[in-house]
A protein has these predicted regions:
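Short, acidic Gly/Pro/Ser/Thr-rich loop/turn segments
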Residues: 343, 348, 541, 705-707, ...
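Hydrophobic, well-ordered secondary-structure elements that form the walls
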Residues: 368, 431, 500, 748, ...
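Extracytoplasmic
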Residues: 137, 391-693, 699-711
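Active-site-proximal, structured, solvent-exposed surfaces of multi-pass membrane proteins
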Residues: 10, 19-28, 554-555, 729-791
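Short, well-structured beta-strand/strand-turn elements
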Residues: 123, 573-576, 771-774
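Non-catalytic C-terminal accessory domains or segments of carbohydrate-active enzymes
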Residues: 539-544, 552-556, 618, 703-752, ...
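Membrane-embedded transmembrane-helix bundle of lipid-linked glycan/lipid transferases
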Residues: 4-411, 415-422, 427, 484-486, ...
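Hydrophobic beta-strand residues in large extracellular and virion-surface proteins
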Residues: 83-90, 191-194, 204-206, 317, ...
Length: 791
């Protein structure tokens, strides 16, 4: 045996292993240095981009941007005062819990940046720069993982310029979604690694990033988890890593649990409360056909149009058709295309029949679809370089066209700001901006932080659904949109708005607007090409006393208040939650979409009230088959119009249904006494729409209150006047009275010479009464003592 030879063999083997380890360390070092170099390049592009964005000015123009900046700025003010949370803000919506039911990360991030900049506009520029760098770094890490640094850098830079990402940032101004879009490359990378590596750290990172996304938007994280779940299901069919992927999706739920410290209280405050019909209606209005969504032309006519990107769609189709080898990589592009299909208007029609469809908004996860397509290109190892160059060129060209259209901030908006300055100068209590949100969130921000030397409280704000006065806001906006100016002015006075700024292009009849303003006490004091300003001539803070002759009870009862301003919407939808004495204070009671806890008690109450000479009208559209006082209703769909219509025994001409409701769903009446005076003829059938239980208790069918509200039909209005025994377009007896309102730390102190004054402060459920007493009236504080202290 040659010992020297064996020793040399093992020596050479050890040396070889050492060289291999040394080479691996050197390769790792080179990769890290390359990553750092490319990160520096990415940061340079981010700086150049923000300078380009601010070339004209540094004022954002997105419809929601200033709402985020407002909350970030007011949270910054709290930091300066040594507090880390906003419990109450008096400026918006007659007082609101500003972060109630809101995810916190966007506002805290803006506030923290503002601690460094002390300028909210510079803060927004820093925010954009960070979004560019964070999102781009995600693709740099993909390049590191795939060992394709140059392509990773290109996609990292491109990610900011994706048409959908630009629209969300600049046009929508949805900073929650902007942050989430920046995190999507990390989410997909960690998810992809977790399915292929049995490393605990991947599961931890995935839970952490889901937690961060949850604290940005709970609605979006639901869609993201659904997207990951469907991807796992799709791969199950293809038999690639299906068991592990399901397990990983389940582990992702831990991320939501990590955010429970904030989200659990927020859920109790309505974080996930969504009106399904409203969401589906909005989705239908803002959805497009698949061809329109990839049309590169439409964005030139409307910068807010949803554009997936023709180039990204074609690249996705290309990779699905021509990628050879690993099927799981091809699946990424295929699944991205499926998400895109989920955004189409055809799919929305199917979606509305699915349970919880209000959460299935695929357009919100468009960036996931695009990221999946980009990742599939990164993982496509045998793709020729010339094809990579062509793909990069068409993606960049498509994206830069959108950037040229919307990728900019603007100059100081002097025209609107002049009107806001004037309104703030003359306002003594609150300003109402009646613009149907067309001015975006800018007025809400500017009236707090923009007017020099003065901060003006407002009736409106931003994200009205979280406001305690949301029902009041909806009624005023509906009145403005449908030209019910009389009730609009009256309800603005009730909310304490002594100054109103109205956007002129929302007004159809300026003479009628003035005619409705005068009896409410408003005087026109300013007008330019865009706005009109009305002022109520009163100094100091004030409340109102009011006497309504009618009360509307139920989910849909408010419809009657537009033509009958003398009706007030009841604060409770259950009839038997009221007392007979409470309801006996009114001359008429209108019920629509009402409820009851005890049917017999409710019936007895209405009989007793009607026997006192008080008119009771029951809108039977939601009554259904269950009899109420012996009367029920049956659904029917009518087309174009009511047909032969008889009122008081005579045939009358009633108007057609609106264009968007040509198929009109309503109900006719069954049971009770035959009337034979108020009916329609349908297919030789006589269908009654008005029945009297007794002289003062009337049942009304055919959805006439709603029909009258949307059409202002004269015959329908006459029927309502007959049924309610009330005259239309009569204001309630309202008077303004001066009161003293003081805010001190977390206390609100009210002093009045009168009791029963409606104070224009939203009655929050979190209020605690320290001194005095109050009740809730139309979501406002109704003073029941001359002094009131709440905190």
């Amino acid at each position: 045996m040659n010992i020297d030879k064996d020793v040399n063999y093992f020596t050479r083997g050890n040396a070889s292993r050492k060289d291999m380890l040394k080479d691996k360390k050197q390769q790792y070092k080179n990769k890290v240095l390359t990553l750092i170099l490319y990160f520096v390049i990415l940061c340079m592009f981010a700086i150049i981009t923000i300078l380009t964005i601010n070339k004209i000015g540094n004022y954002p123009w997105g419809s929601e941007t200033f709402g985020y900046l407002y909350k970030g700025n007011i949270l910054y003010d709290s930091f300066i005062n040594g507090e880390s949370f906003i419990s109450y803000d008096i400026n918006w919506y007659n007082g609101t819990q500003l972060l109630k039911g809101s995810e916190p990360i966007p506002y805290y991030l803006l506030a923290l940046i503002n601690l460094l900049t002390n300028d909210i506009y510079v803060t927004f520029s820093v925010f954009i720069t960070l979004v560019f760098i964070v999102g781009g770094t995600g693709f740099l890490l993909w390049g590191y993982y795939c060992n394709r640094f140059k392509l990773g850098l290109f996609f990292g830079i491109l990610w900011f310029f994706i048409p959908n990402n630009l629209r969300v940032l600049f046009s929508e101004g949805n900073l929650q979604l902007v942050i989430i879009n920046a995190l999507i490359p990390y989410l997909l990378l960690i998810y992809y690694k977790a399915t292929r590596e049995n490393k605990f750290k991947n599961y931890v990172f995935l839970s952490v990033i889901i937690c961060i996304i949850s604290l940005n938007s709970m609605h979006i994280v639901i869609m993201i988890l659904l997207a990951l779940f469907l991807l796992a299901v799709f791969d199950t069919i293809r038999k690639t890593y299906f068991g592990k992927k399901f397990f990983i999706v389940l582990l992702s739920l831990l991320g939501i649990l990590l955010s429970a410290f904030w989200l659990v209280p927020a859920l109790g405050e309505g974080l996930l409360n969504s009106n399904k019909s409203e969401v589906i209606q909005k989705l239908t209005q803002n959805s497009y056909s698949l061809l329109d969504s990839i049309s590169p032309v439409l964005r030139f006519y409307n910068v807010e149009v949803y554009y997936f990107g023709l180039s990204f769609f074609l690249v996705g189709i290309f990779s699905v058709l021509f990628m050879n080898g690993r099927r799981d990589i091809k699946n990424l592009s295929f699944y991205g295309i499926l998400i895109f299909i989920g955004t189409s208007n055809v799919f929305i029609k199917v979606l509305k029949n699915i349970p919880f469809s209000e959460f299935l908004i695929f357009s919100k996860v468009t960036s996931i679809a695009i990221a999946l397509i980009l990742v599939s290109i990164l993982l496509w190892r045998n793709l020729r370089k010339v094809l990579i160059v062509i793909i990069c060129f068409i993606l960049l060209s498509d994206s830069m066209l959108t950037f040229d259209l919307i990728g900019h901030n603007r100059e100081f908006p002097e025209g609107l700001v002049y009107s806001l300055d004037y309104a703030s100068e003359i306002a003594t209590q609150r300003i109402g901006i009646l613009d149907l949100s067309q001015y975006g969130a800018l007025p809400s921000y500017y009236l707090k932080y923009g007017v020099k030397g003065k901060s003006s409280n407002q009736v409106f704000g931003w994200q009205w659904k979280s406001a305690n006065t949301s029902e009041n806001i909806v009624m005023i906006n509906t009145a403005l949109e449908n030209n019910y100016y009389l009730v609009m002015f009256d309800r603005c006075i009730q909310l304490g708005a002594d100054t109103l700024l109205i956007k002129k292009d929302l007004i159809n009849d300026f003479n009628y607007l003035d005619e409705c303003a005068n009896p409410n006490g408003y005087i026109k004091v300013y007008e330019d090409t865009n706005d009109i300003i009305y002022k109520y001539p009163i100094e100091g803070t004030f409340g109102t006393t009011v006497k309504f002759d009618g009360i509307a009870i139920g989910k849909y009862a408010e419809n009657i208040c537009y033509s009958f301003p003398n009706f007030t919407k009841g604060d409770k939808d259950y009839i038997d939650d009221y007392t007979v004495s409470e309801l006996s204070e009114f001359k008429a009671i209108f019920l629509s979409g009402f409820k009851y806890r005890d049917k017999k008690k409710a019936e007895d109450m209405l009989k007793e009230i009607s026997e006192k000479g008080i008119r009771v009208v029951v809108d039977s559209n939601e009554l259904g088959d269950e009899e109420f006082l012996g009367i029920s209703s049956k659904k029917i769909d009518l087309e174009d119009n009511y047909g032969e219509f008889y009122f008081k025994g005579e045939r009358v001409k009633i108007g057609d249904f609106p264009e968007d409701e040509k198929i009109f769903r309503c109900s006719y009446l069954l049971g009770g006494k035959d009337d034979n005076n108020n009916y329609i003829n349908v297919d030789t059938r006589m269908l009654e729409y008005m029945k009297y239980y007794n002289e003062n208790l009337v049942f009304l069918g055919l959805n006439i209150p709603y029909f009258e509200m949307i059409t202002k039909d004269d015959v329908a209005l006459e029927i309502l006047e007959e049924a309610t025994n009330m005259e239309s377009y009569i204001l309630p007896d309202r008077k303004c009275v001066n009161i003293q309102i003081d805010f001190e730390s977390n206390r609100i102190m009210v002093n009045s010479e009168n009791n029963d004054v409606i104070v224009p402060i939203a009655a929050l459920s979190s209020f605690e009464t320290i001194e005095g007493s109050y009740q809730v009236f139309n979501n406002l504080v109704n003073l029941k003592s001359k002094e009131l202290v709440i905190e």
